[in-house]
Amino acid sequence: MATIQALRGTKDIFAPEIAYWQQVEAVVRDCLGRAMYQEIRTPIFEQTSLFERGIGEATDVVSKEMYSFTDRGDRPITLRPEGTAGAVRAYIERKLFAQGGVQRLWYTGPMFRYERPQAGRQRQFHQVGVEVLGSADPRADVEVMAIATEILQKLGLKNLSLQLNSVGNGGDRQRYREALVDYLTPFKADLDADSQERLERNPLRILDSKDQKTQEIAQNAPSILDYLGDDSKKHFDQVQSSLTALGIDYVLNPCLVRGLDYYTHTAFEIQSSDLGAQATVCGGGRYDGLVAELGGPETPAVGWAIGLERLVILLQQLGEASGPQLDFYLVSKGEQAEAAAVILAHKLRFAGFSVELDLSGSAFGKQFKRADRSGAIACLVLGDEEAVNQQVQLKWLQTKAQETLAQADLLGNLESWRQKMQQAKH
């Protein structure tokens, strides 16, 4: 019988790789928690119309990449390709706007797009995202960019570049769209096939083409920054001056338009030169019209998403992930000893120590070898004799020093043992 394997574009994550994921999640929770962002959890699948209306039917994500199907109730359903639309749907449905003020939200989880799998790009991939809803202030744009920068810096990542642009408001984009089409039309035959199609329905996306010839043509295209109205210019100037005041370097990139139709004003990406073609680690911007487009009140908003797979690739390049060290590896042999070991392991774990209990039932020699490989600070040894006498042998695995203790002394002086374990770690 043929074995069943994971689908193309998906992967299982085990140790030691999982340690990098845990490292990222810990830093994210710390940074966002201190900035008072509230975690939300939204469904993995939504009505297809949410993404058609929210992301835009002309985008590649909606027209080519979504996992969509009709369920048994004849409802069109889509596995979420990104997180913002679902977060906004929840914001509207739960009437969070009625609370007044600014809502700072964040989420993490799997997303799904039918793409060609490659390094840093999977069909099931994972993102962390933030959404700030209810503020049109340029400081909100700067806050989310500063937090993204902080997360990446705390992870120790280098060779990063914040790419910054403004796509203005609807009127700005319409004026620019006309100028861009006028410029590109004479070059239509030289554009790649996707860009020729986009020229008619979504010309700004041509600026984001990965085709070399199209990129060369786009380099001389008019800049959207020259088509910003006074309000858009003022907003973008304030964003830039605040980033400068924070000491956050950025590069103006007039070709940066992002792949989703809902963006307005600020658009940005954080890219890594260590990732090759899939260089974008974080992408986001302002989306002042999305809440109203999805049936809510006019609500300004800004956010970003970080791709976790690409972060993990960068962290792996830096070296081994630093996971928590195991305190005790507990070995036992004999009926009474094995029963006592279960109780001792539970009590130590409840007290806050990490304990791995050997469940193999093999000879002590084999258990000791596993203890040496476990990375534990100390090995606890229980035989039937120790179990009867309420004792335990403790062996420090680095120094090989060994002593016999009463279990009551071990459990009764946990703070003293905690200090000893901390000293052994250093």
UniProtKB/Swiss-Prot annotation:
What reaction does this enzyme carry out catalytically?
tRNA(His) + L-histidine + ATP = L-histidyl-tRNA(His) + AMP + diphosphate + H(+)
The transmembrane residues are none
> Organism source for this protein?
Picosynechococcus sp. (strain ATCC 27264 / PCC 7002 / PR-6) (Agmenellum quadruplicatum)
In its UniProt record, a GO molecular function of this protein is: ATP binding
How does the record describe its quaternary structure? Homodimer.
Protein family according to the UniProt entry: Belongs to the class-II aminoacyl-tRNA synthetase family.
Q: What is the primary gene name for this protein?
A: hisS
Q: Indicate where this protein resides in the cell.
A: Cytoplasm
Give the signal peptide, or none.
none
NCBIfam families linked to this entry: hisS
Q: What EC number(s) does its UniProt record assign?
A: 6.1.1.21
Protein name, per record: Histidine--tRNA ligase
